[in-house]
């Protein structure tokens, strides 16, 4: 079954040699260029022109690719910030878990937290979760972060497409009797990164990762991610693209 129609941008000769060494037939369209920055530019241009619906990073630097992607001339940005959204299948949990943001926004302010929630809810909708339960994770201590989470929770209290609660601790967020959440919003990037990787390495879970908030889904898997995570991330990108990401942000 054909899921995507890939188009590769980069050094065609090197790609062919690598494919041959792996015993793989590279029977796909390749746009040849020896310059990785030019490859990034052409890939971004292809999604900007609607020739492609998903952007996936290959062997190029993330910073260089994103600096090109965010140029105003391509009109791929929206009013929201970009945030990393990961989707996890954990053997001990009865449904998928969406986590954000563990990879893009280092120390979000209130408006950025709103965007992070919006992006995560959008991904949850793409997964077929009509009214996701969103947990704003925290420790319960009285500090400025807790106050911000309370404000954030109240801002979403009249929404009909999601249920946002918090701040709430992780154990309550995952408890069937309490939260049984679909979406976990972490307080900062370090918590999101550690939580996401812990679910993969300690719980033997599966993960898919995308960057949401732009007019096309972006797949920025790291070199440490295995084939399964890359494949599942592509599937997630397809679901988001099919959900009409260009017209819903």
Task: Please annotate each region the language model reported.
Residues 1-249:
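Anion-binding alpha/beta catalytic cores of soluble intermediary-metabolism enzymes, centered on
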